[in-house]
A protein has these predicted regions:
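Common nucleic-acid-contacting/processivity interface regions adjacent to the catalytic cores
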Residues: 1-25, 44, 53-55, 108-121, ...
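Conserved structured core elements
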Residues: 5, 9-20, 41-44, 68-71, ...
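Residue-identity detector for threonine
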Residues: 12-13, 33-36, 47, 67, ...
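Active-site palm subdomain of RNA-directed nucleic acid polymerases
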Residues: 19-47
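C-terminal polymerase-core module
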Residues: 51-178
Length: 178
């Protein structure tokens, strides 16, 4: 008696609108900045996340730097360019939707140099910086894969974790040897 399907659909639809709105705005901004046309820089979207590829931008501007330098460049771009752009974009959405006030907030979570998606909510990310904290050594973030499921035997989980290190940091030959 407290559940109304119309309210649930309204909440779901407004969430989808807001995340797609920002994905489109980010794609348009990066296409304009990099002088590309209809290139999709958004790798994936989730209910509350946008996974964005800055590879082309980083290679164009900071391609001569090492990985640490590239991560620092991405961190600066996220803080100085993307965050204000996202805030402004959500303000535009609030005005477009005639909202009472703008309540959408999106912050950068991780910066990575490598990632693998197998399906929705199933991925591996080689994280160098998480919410502004720079790691001395990258940490592997795993979501939804067998290596983080409790139903997978511990021995298998450990071997899968080890294989990830080879996949992310080794060569194809190293993986075949493993």
């Amino acid at each position: 008696r407290y559940f109304d399907i119309r309210m649930a659909e309204g909440i779901t639809t407004s969430g989808q609108l807001s995340i797609r709105w920002m994905a489109n705005k980010l794609n348009n901004m990066l296409n304009k900045t990099l002088k590309t046309q209809d290139k999709d820089f958004v790798i994936a979207i989730d209910t509350d996340s946008i996974y964005l590829s800055l590879e082309e931008l980083v290679e164009k501007v900071a391609g001569d730097k090492d990985t640490v330098g590239k991560i620092k460049y991405m961190d600066r771009i996220c803080e100085e360019v993307l965050q204000p752009f996202i805030d402004q974009g959500y303000q535009e959405l609030a005005e477009y939707m005639n909202a009472y006030s703008q309540k959408m907030i999106m912050k950068r979570e991780v910066l990575a140099d490598k990632a693998i998606w197998t399906a929705k909510k199933r991925y591996v990310i080689n994280v160098h910086n998480s919410e502004g904290v720079q790691f001395a050594k990258p940490k592997v973030k795993v979501m939804g894969l067998e290596m983080v499921k409790s139903s997978t035997p511990a021995v298998i989980r450990d071997k899968l974790h080890d294989s990830l290190q080879v996949i992310l940091h080794g060569s194809e030959k190293d993986l075949h040897k493993y």
